[in-house]
Amino acid sequence: GNQRLNLTRITEPLDFVEKHLWDSLAGLLLCPTIAQLTQIQVIDIGTGAGFPGLPTAIAFPDWSITLLDSTRKKIQFIDELLTTLQITNAKTWLGRAETLSGDRCHRSYYDLALIRAVAQPAICAQYALPLVKLDGWVVLYRGQWEKAETEALMPIVAELGGKIETIKTIQTPWTSGIRNLIYLRKVKSTVATLPRLQRKTILKFRQFS
């Protein structure tokens, strides 16, 4: 299926385990407060080929996962996977995060948002924070991370009603690649006029390279 649809560039088994499965779950397991949550609503923004959402659904069977992507063929592929793997606690949603945040059925609905993307962290925060409820979490999966990025992100996160709870820097187990996990917490409601995202501001998703 992956060769047919070209959903991920990672084809070697060990690379797949490290850069998809390990990466997906590390962001959750390294934060005990999140890992201990039960029966929560989770959204994977820009899921692509289903990461980190699919491994999350398998590892946390009492979580309800929404897999969001704007590409129909990716959603169709994931729908097939959900059926084949008999994963019943995940569903797909075809759409864009910038429009979903204006939908009252999704805004302030989720306990946890996950996002692995190459867009600027500020854009990722604008997509994710309006979707989580008070006291909810956002996990930004990043590669390299600089102190200046933290300083630039802080006021934007605050405007959206969040705060940077912590940042964890880790190494992958086999190739020693650097990963940074930015944990945001929703501490007050996002005002109705936010996020101020233009239609042309499109988040382009990819998996870690």
Residue ranges and their predicted role:
Residues 60, 132-134:
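Helix-to-beta-strand junctions that scaffold the AdoMet/dcAdoMet cofactor pocket
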Residues 98, 143-147, 172:
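Short "lid" loop at the C-terminus of a central beta-strand within the Rossmann-like core
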Residues 135-145:
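Conserved beta-strand signature within the Rossmann-like core of class I S-adenosyl-L-methionine
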Residues 1-32:
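Conserved AdoMet
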Residues 25-117, 125:
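Conserved SAM/SAH cofactor-binding pocket of Class I
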Residues 74-76, 146, 150:
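Short alpha-helix immediately C-terminal to the canonical SAM-binding loop
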Residues 151-209:
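SAM/dcSAM-binding transferase cores
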Residues 11, 94-96, 166-168:
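Short loop/edge segments at beta-strand edges and connector loops
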